[in-house]
């Protein structure tokens, strides 16, 4: 896990002052904020023309002192960083900057399915059948890969994404379908305790396997 100093004033990113240096990344804007963390659009690369856009998923500083939460965050990273499939947004790095843990994730230039469905409702139309079939096919391919993926000594990840819901499925402007956010998932490699009687995800989209 990489560690670095950010070189920016403490709390600057939370005041909406962008761009903001964060380790070797430059945060361009905040995309969302929840009770556990924030999502930023960022770029990496110092040479003009060789910059790359990424997504930075950063947990809130006050949660860094919660050992159980950090263990689960690292579990997520250890699982997600092993996945390399065309239909899964790739995790490039897990690290810590000035005590703030983060993931650097592939940026998908497109729209999530929730936004596509909302646009269809507003316009009184439906998603084309061929697009629905494409999304379903590619989702199945990505999930099957994650479930059968093996690591050292042939151990299977046996990974189940517990929240395959419209916000967690991206469709790029080039027609690629990508699964994002394996943060709510069950894997054979997780070390943090989990209660088998507790289900994770959105009720209408919970994985039946859990």
Question: What label would you give each PLM region?
Answer:
Residues 2-210:
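Conserved ATP-binding/catalytic core of the eukaryotic-like protein kinase fold
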């Amino acid at each position: 896990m990489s560690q670095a100093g950010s070189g920016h004033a403490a709390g600057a990113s939370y005041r909406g002052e962008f761009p903001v240096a964060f380790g070797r990344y430059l945060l361009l804007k905040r995309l969302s904020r929840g009770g556990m963390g924030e999502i930023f659009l960022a770029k990496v690369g110092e040479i003009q023309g060789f910059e790359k856009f990424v997504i930075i998923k950063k947990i809130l500083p006050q949660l860094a002192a919660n050992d159980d939460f950090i263990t689960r965050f690292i579990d997520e990273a250890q699982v997600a960083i092993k996945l390399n499939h065309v239909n899964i947004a790739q995790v490039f790095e897990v690290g810590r900057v000035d005590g703030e843990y983060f993931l650097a994730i592939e940026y998908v230039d497109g729209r999530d399915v929730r936004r596509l469905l909302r646009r269809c409702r507003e316009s009184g139309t439906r998603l084309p059948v061929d697009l629905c079939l494409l999304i379903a096919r590619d989702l199945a391919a990505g999930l099957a890969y994650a479930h059968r993926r093996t690591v050292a000594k042939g151990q299977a990840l046996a990974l189940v994404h517990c929240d395959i819901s419209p916000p967690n499925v991206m469709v790029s402007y080039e027609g690629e379908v990508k699964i994002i956010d394996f943060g709510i998932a069950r894997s054979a490699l997780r070390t943090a305790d989990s209660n088998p009687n507790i289900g994770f995800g959105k009720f209408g989209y919970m994985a039946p396997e859990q």
